[in-house]
Structures are given as structure tokens and as C-alpha cells.
């Protein structure tokens, strides 16, 4: 039986201005392509779906890419559980900005890695491409993340990009939980050894005192 529980995932769409963040988000939520470019300050959308047999409620934050809104970035980076890092394959500058966004996420989260998916958008404009697929794949490899080429206009790999991020979050959380459990197990295993060491020290002290003074040791 499939689960009816809807686990909420806070997804944040990040990238330079004009790369198609809003178009991707609205295609996911409304199955509609927004042709005109209207710079976003911050919009939030929610979508119920099922991913690998598990219910999910996607809370998607579509963010501003313009430099004048950069002060807002750290605020949404603190709350995001996973990030779509989006660039436009016809814009070299949008590709170059990805590393800056990624490093800022790691700094805010104080982590060496974090759930992200690298999204190369506007792949329907192949004739105008200036960032090769190989370059995108290499960048994704350096960030230890999945690489997806999308077209908001053609609705190509839109769901795959968002759903892959949810899967990445799930794997990351399981890994973090396992690491925490292992740490707890190590700490628990160390307690008896530490206790035994203290007990041994007390017994040795007691023996020495009994021999020399015949006094009782209170500890």
C-alpha cells in the first residue's frame, strides 16, 4: 500500500536573472509556459505529488536572481532543504555565477556538501548554446550533484529536475541520520570503557590507602 503521508520539502530555485527559474517553477506547478520575462522578487508555490511511491508536498521558492536582491539570499538559503541551481545554456555569465551560489549555500549551511541539482535550462535553444554539456557535467561532478538539461518551453525534464532534488534530499537525510546514529553508538561504546577505567583507578587508590593507612576511601 502506498503511503498517504505527505512529507514537506522546502525547495529553492536559485540562479542568475533571466535563466528561466520562474518558467520552470510555473511549468511544474501549473503546466503552463510563461513566455515573457518578468523579474521575480520572491514567489512561493506548493504542489502535492508522489515520488517513488511516497507522498510529497513540494514547497517551492522561486527567488530573485538580480544582484540588487542578493541581501535576501542568505535568508532563504537558511530555510531551504535543497536547491536547484539553474543557468541558461545560451549565457556564459549565468553559468559562471553557479559556483558563487553554491559556495554561498555551503557557507550558510556550514556544510561541505548539501542537496543540490544543477539545471541547464533552455536546451531548446541548442543553436544558440554557448555552454557545452560537457562543461555542465564537469561542474556538477565538482559539486557532487546530478546534472539535468531542461526546457521550460517544451516541458522537458522539468518534473525530473525537481523530483531528482527530492530524491537527493532523501538520500542526504538518511546519510545524516546514519552518521548521527554511528556517532551515538561510538559515544555509547566509549562510556563503559571510561567508567571501567575510573573504577580501576578508584580500586587501585583504595588498595594503596588500605595498605598504608587502613582508611576507607569515599568517592
Curated annotation (Swiss-Prot):
S-farnesyl cysteine lipid attachment residues: 216
Keyword Protein biosynthesis belongs to the record: no
Topology of this chain in the membrane: Lipid-anchor
Protein EC: 3.6.5.2
Residues reported in the UniProt entry to bind GTP: 15-22, 62-66, 121-124
Motif Effector region per record, residues: 37-45
Alphabetical UniProt keywords: Cell membrane, Cell shape, GTP-binding, Hydrolase, Lipoprotein, Membrane, Methylation, Nucleotide-binding, Prenylation
GO cellular component, one term: Cdc42 GTPase complex
Propeptide: 217-219
Documented activity regulation: Alternates between an inactive form bound to GDP and an active form bound to GTP. Activated by a guanine nucleotide-exchange factor (GEF) and inactivated by a GTPase-activating protein (GAP).
GO biological process terms, semicolon-separated: conjugation with cellular fusion; establishment of cell polarity; establishment or maintenance of cell polarity; positive regulation of conjugation with cellular fusion; positive regulation of mating projection assembly; positive regulation of pheromone response MAPK cascade; positive regulation of protein import into nucleus; protein localization to plasma membrane
UniProt cross-references to InterPro entries, sorted A to Z: P-loop_NTPase (IPR027417), Small_GTP-bd (IPR005225), Small_GTPase (IPR001806), Small_GTPase_Ras-type (IPR020849)
Annotated localization: Cell membrane
Biological role: Participates in the process of sexual differentiation and the determination of cell shape. Essential for mating and for recognition of the mating pheromone, but not for vegetative growth. Does not regulate the intracellular cAMP level. Regulates two downstream pathways, namely the byr2/byr1/spk1 mitogen-activated protein kinase cascade and the cdc42 small G protein pathway. The former is relevant to mating and sporulation, whereas the latter is relevant to mating, cell growth and cell morphology.
Similarity section: Belongs to the small GTPase superfamily. Ras family.
Protein name: Ras-like protein 1
Species assigned in the record: Schizosaccharomyces pombe (strain 972 / ATCC 24843) (Fission yeast)
Amino acid at each position: 500500500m502506498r503511503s498517504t503521508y505527505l512529507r514537506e520539502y522546502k525547495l529553492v530555485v536559485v540562479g542568475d536573472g533571466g535563466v528561466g527559474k520562474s518558467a520552470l517553477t510555473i511549468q511544474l506547478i501549473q503546466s503552463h509556459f510563461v513566455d515573457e520575462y518578468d523579474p521575480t522578487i520572491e514567489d512561493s508555490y506548493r504542489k502535492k505529488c508522489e515520488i517513488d511511491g511516497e507522498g510529497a508536498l513540494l514547497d517551492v521558492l522561486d527567488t530573485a536572481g538580480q544582484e540588487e536582491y542578493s541581501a535576501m539570499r542568505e535568508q532563504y538559503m537558511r530555510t531551504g532543504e535543497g536547491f536547484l541551481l539553474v543557468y541558461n545554456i545560451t549565457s556564459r555569465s549565468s553559468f559562471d555565477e553557479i559556483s558563487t551560489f553554491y559556495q554561498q549555500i555551503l557557507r550558510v549551511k556550514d556544510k561541505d556538501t548539501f542537496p543540490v541539482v544543477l539545471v541547464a535550462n533552455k536546451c531548446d535553444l541548442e543553436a544558440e548554446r554557448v555552454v557545452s554539456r560537457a562543461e555542465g557535467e564537469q561542474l556538477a561532478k565538482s559539486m557532487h550533484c546530478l546534472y539535468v538539461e531542461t526546457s521550460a518551453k517544451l516541458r522537458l525534464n522539468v518534473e525530473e529536475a525537481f523530483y531528482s532534488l527530492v530524491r537527493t534530499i532523501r538520500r542526504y537525510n538518511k546519510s545524516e541520520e546514519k552518521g548521527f546514529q554511528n556517532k551515538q553508538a561510538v559515544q555509547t561504546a566509549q562510556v563503559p570503557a571510561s567508567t571501567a577505567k575510573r573504577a580501576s583507578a578508584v580500586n587501585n587508590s583504595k588498595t594503596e590507602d588500605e595498605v598504608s593507612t587502613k582508611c576507607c576511601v569515599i568517592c
